[in-house]
Amino acid sequence: MMPPWLLARTLIMALFFSCLTPGSLNPCIEVVPNITYQCMDQKLSKVPDDIPSSTKNIDLSFNPLKILKSYSFSNFSELQWLDLSRCEIETIEDKAWHGLHHLSNLILTGNPIQSFSPGSFSGLTSLENLVAVETKLASLESFPIGQLITLKKLNVAHNFIHSCKLPAYFSNLTNLVHVDLSYNYIQTITVNDLQFLRENPQVNLSLDMSLNPIDFIQDQAFQGIKLHELTLRGNFNSSNIMKTCLQNLAGLHVHRLILGEFKDERNLEIFEPSIMEGLCDVTIDEFRLTYTNDFSDDIVKFHCLANVSAMSLAGVSIKYLEDVPKHFKWQSLSIIRCQLKQFPTLDLPFLKSLTLTMNKGSISFKKVALPSLSYLDLSRNALSFSGCCSYSDLGTNSLRHLDLSFNGAIIMSANFMGLEELQHLDFQHSTLKRVTEFSAFLSLEKLLYLDISYTNTKIDFDGIFLGLTSLNTLKMAGNSFKDNTLSNVFANTTNLTFLDLSKCQLEQISWGVFDTLHRLQLLNMSHNNLLFLDSSHYNQLYSLSTLDCSFNRIETSKGILQHFPKSLAFFNLTNNSVACICEHQKFLQWVKEQKQFLVNVEQMTCATPVEMNTSLVLDFNNSTCYMYKTIISVSVVSVIVVSTVAFLIYHFYFHLILIAGCKKYSRGESIYDAFVIYSSQNEDWVRNELVKNLEEGVPRFHLCLHYRDFIPGVAIAANIIQEGFHKSRKVIVVVSRHFIQSRWCIFEYEIAQTWQFLSSRSGIIFIVLEKVEKSLLRQQVELYRLLSRNTYLEWEDNPLGRHIFWRRLKNALLDGKASNPEQTAEEEQETATWT
């Protein structure tokens, strides 16, 4: 019987191995389940057995497979793409590809294959692309691919092939369209080498012979041969050899001929114009010249290419292109990465397409005369335009495509008059000037595509897009709007399906901006400064499927979120400043409920409060809000009650003291004739004028002044009430600008009103010391009303005015004053003496 400990170990091991799935030991990476597997550089010596039979794509590159044995891939009947690059394969046995009836792409790059058997490629009945670069292949004759009747592209570059002779089995490859023989050791091309092409004129083959050290092409080697494309780049060591070889291309009919060199590999120091004379006997539809040094500016020497339909110059050191003969029948001209010092002067009646891009150096646009031009690409040149754009600039009214992107300053001076056929217009990353001063696009009713992204445009004119009734794509990212508010500029573009407003510094959206865009499908509002998500802006977008509001500062929603269009399928709200607080509970709950169309909702994080920073929005717990609401409600009610009681006590405290004082002093005599309320700014006038004339004059009055009569150690408010109001018959209010602006003076005045009401007598005398603006006076409504309805004294600093002022003031103070015989006699005596 098995010992217990041994039985336990056995069961544990059995359980462990039973949990392992077949794929758990597979070193390959599952890119697409059951479809694509990445097994690169896993030190595999054979094809893994546990890859699913349904696999269509396998990358086995950089594994030491050494030998491909028969039936190596028989388990992968659905395989379509196979990469065996640099697997050290030396031998391919017969039937190695057995069962791969659907394989269309096979890559054997970098394998030192020593020899091929006749059946090395048997079974590949659907192969279309075969790459055998760096496989030590010595000739096409020894390459057994005659049975690959579906083959379209053959790449045998960078091998040891010395002859370009196309074997007889090529007649079986009726679908072959491209053969790459570049970077081999082919030095000569003879008549017999291309006999297959001569006997099969129906073959439309592209042949790449670049980087072969060709020094001789036999006369009539290409006579009667038809090719789709012939590439001869970096083949010739001297101009004379190149000229002779090109002359021996006579009789060739080629759709596209590519000559020249490579950017980093130059054999010819000087490209002499006479070289091109060798092409006069070659029928060429399209010609391309690449990376040549010291190229002649005399384009007339291209007379052998006068009848080509397309001319292309790429990386050519040409500095001027002018005086191109009008009889040249070029329909397409491309000038890419050249070194032009000025814009080409062109007058070509047949030219339909002009591409001038990535020129090395800044140039200014010049007017051209191209009546047939329909396509114009002038992008990435640092071009400057002093005026754009109209028929007079281009000399054509057939233009449909205009690309002026990635240039310098473009001054808009016309509204495309004569260019009404335009359908595509691109200004991105150029600086547009004056584009908002008028309706620059008014004539472009047929325009379908407009890109003004990153053009330093500040949109402050709602009519900027007037006339664009057919526009379906509008890109305007990286610009700005007046007051950072998206204004109603889309009223006329009712056919828009794509609108990009990203990085426009937008903070607000005007009401009804999108209401006419019923066909809009994609709206990009990302990378702006929007604070709220307002669904009412989008409820008229009946066709909207994608809305991107990511990278804004959105904290919460505004309004009812159910207003989003039913067609909306993708909505991106990531990277916003979402506030995960109970105040925004409805918005947070809505986010949780809309997982089906919110993009990357599981990555949405909270920005505030601080304790929830970087927390996931989906983790916000709504239940805590109910508890908080109860606590907050009780707290708020308590605070309101306490605050109300405190406010009432504070507000009426002094009035209560005043009432109590009135009862206390109601039967006693007043000590003072008047209590003076004034601003400290007017104290000089009170001391030098008021006190001097009333207390030292005739009759004498006794005034209550705070700086003299208030009791030290007692609160100011208590002194005002007890010493000022309760012991005075009247109150003198000295009104001035500073008085109205002083909160303390206004407080004293309000207490005086209460005192007057409680004493049931007219005891307040107003003195307007200086002219006070009505606007300032209206700030104190009650004071303004009293001054409007009651008589007051105005101080006038002149003899007559002073005399009247003091007489009226003394009469007002005498009103209600009890008579004192001794004081009256004394005053009469002083009066007589004074008289």
Curated annotation (Swiss-Prot):
Glycan attachment points: N34, N75, N172, N204, N237, N307, N492, N495, N524, N572, N575, N613, N621, N622
Protein name, as recorded: Toll-like receptor 4
Keywords: Cell membrane, Cell projection, Disease variant, Disulfide bond, Endosome, Glycoprotein, Immunity, Inflammatory response, Innate immunity, Leucine-rich repeat, Membrane, NAD, Receptor, Repeat, Signal, Transmembrane, Transmembrane helix, Ubl conjugation
Organism: Mus musculus (Mouse)
Region annotated Interaction with SCIMP, chain positions: 670-835
Annotated LRR repeat ranges: 54-75, 78-99, 102-123, 126-147, 150-171, 175-198, 204-224, 226-247, 248-269, 329-349, 350-370, 372-392, 398-420, 421-442, 446-467, 470-490, 495-516, 519-540, 543-564
Superkingdom per UniProt: Eukaryota
Protein's cellular compartments: Cell membrane; Early endosome; Cell projection, Ruffle
Mutation effect (E593D): In strain: A/J, BALB/cJ, P/J, SODL/EI, SEA/GNJ, NZW/LACJ and VM/DK
Gene Ontology CC entries for this record: early endosome; endosome membrane; external side of plasma membrane; lipopolysaccharide receptor complex; perinuclear region of cytoplasm; phagocytic cup; plasma membrane; receptor complex
All ranges on the Extracellular side of the membrane: 26-638
Topology, Cytoplasmic side: 660-835
Record-annotated membrane-spanning stretches: 639-659
